[in-house]
A protein has these predicted regions:
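Catalytic nucleophile-loop/oxyanion-hole region of alpha/beta-hydrolase
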Residues: 90-102, 119-140
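Short beta-strand immediately N-terminal to the catalytic nucleophile in serine-hydrolase-like folds
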Residues: 162-164
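C-terminal catalytic-base region of ester-bond hydrolases, centering on the histidine
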Residues: 261-347
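Domain-level recognition of soluble alpha/beta enzyme cores
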Residues: 22-85, 105, 265, 302-303
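Short beta-strand/loop motif that positions the catalytic acidic residue
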Residues: 247, 253-255
Length: 347
């Protein structure tokens, strides 16, 4: 009987996702100012709307394509699961537009904040060094959207997840219950000084006094987060094995498999994944994905355009095989969707 009920729920979910195949993508930008952190958050929110809503394109420029959205459109009725996306160091909510679009079309609300101090147009060291506030940013977004269903749709409070790329991967693992140890990480960097994580950590000037080390070493878990997905995370070697073993929500760890001496899967994502409880964790390495394959697609000629503005940064358009980035994105989005559907079925 239990099996039949589970199968029935699964079929129901599949039908509901299929029914949303032609749904439009609503879009709003909000600012969250409440809080004691003096840390206003710029947040992009994407949500299901009627496919007949008026549309425009956002996120497009000479280097990157955008997506089609309906700005400030009224949300569809009903409850929807919420996914909050955390960008990497120096990134922004634009980096995972492709994922937001794919998830909204499957019936999710997706929210993505710009993290102060580590986002494209705000790289202030004094904000970046408050690394422990990154997970809190995600929690603030959850609180804000739960409190205002009339704006972007009603959130199903039992189906809330977080997805993070690079430093965002560290952010969501902290929300799941991972505990960072500044002492452990700094000791490890003496052995692995060439890792990008060690370089970024030093650039952010993290944990330079006792007070900040105490804040960073605290638990930053949010029990409202019921599942997390990490996309080629950094700073993994600072999360304690004891805290990883105690995580009791579903975790999907995805890694770029294309060789990268500065962010090797073997020392970052895979090393972390083997410390998670196998009963509710999944690890997948994508052989032809680079670290930047999880970011937005690039237009033809984008490498030259980006290099002209910022020499060397055109590398963000490079993938590791014959597949296009769009094909990689399709597979990643499918993996995430399947993982989340399974996570929602767990008691």
């Amino acid at each position: 009987m239990a099996w039949r009920i589970t199968l029935g729920l699964f079929i129901s979910l599949l039908l509901s996702f299929a029914a949303l195949a032609d749904v439009g993508v609503g879009f709003q930008q909000i600012t969250i100012v409440k809080g004691a952190d003096n840390r206003p958050l710029d947040v992009a929110v994407f949500y299901p709307v009627s496919s007949s809503s008026q549309t425009t394109i956002i996120g497009e420029n000479a280097a990157f394509p955008g997506i089609t959205v309906s700005k400030n459109a009224a949300p569809e009725s009903g409850k929807y699961p919420l996914i909050v996306v955390s960008h990497g160091y120096g990134g922004s909510w634009l980096n995972q537009l492709w994922l937001a679009e794919a998830l909204v079309k499957q019936g999710y609300i997706v929210a993505a904040p710009n993290h102060p101090g580590t986002t494209t147009k705000d790289m202030r060291t004094e904000k970046a060094q408050e690394l422990w506030l990154r997970p809190h940013d995600i929690s603030r977004v959850v609180t804000a959207l739960l409190a205002a269903p009339e704006k972007t749709g009603r959130v199903d409070e039992k189906r809330i997840a977080a997805v993070g790329h690079s430093l965002g991967g560290w952010t969501v693992l902290e929300l799941a219950g991972g505990r960072f140890s500044a002492a452990q990480f700094e000791q490890d960097c003496l052995t692995h000084a060439g890792l990008a994580s060690c370089k970024v950590y030093e650039r952010m000037q993290v944990a330079k006094n006792a007070a900040s080390r105490t804040q960073l070493d605290k638990s930053l878990a949010d029990p409202r987060i019921r599942a997390v997905v990490s996309l080629d995370m950094g700073l993994a070697r600072g999360i304690t094995a004891q805290s990883l073993a105690a995580i009791n929500i579903p975790v999907l760890i995805m890694a770029a498999g294309y060789p990268n001496e500065e962010l090797p899967a073997a020392l970052e994502s895979h090393d972390l994944a083997r410390k998670l409880p196998p009963a509710h964790s999944t690890y997948k390495e994508i052989a032809d994905a680079t670290h930047f394959s999880f970011m937005q697609r690039c237009k033809p000629g984008a490498i030259d355009i980006i290099n002209a503005e910022s020499p060397g940064d055109g590398m963000i358009c490079l993938d590791g095989g014959e597949r296009s980035r769009e094909q990689i994105h399709q597979d990643v989005a499918q993996d995430i969707s399947e993982f989340l559907r399974a996570a929602w079925r767990k008691p």
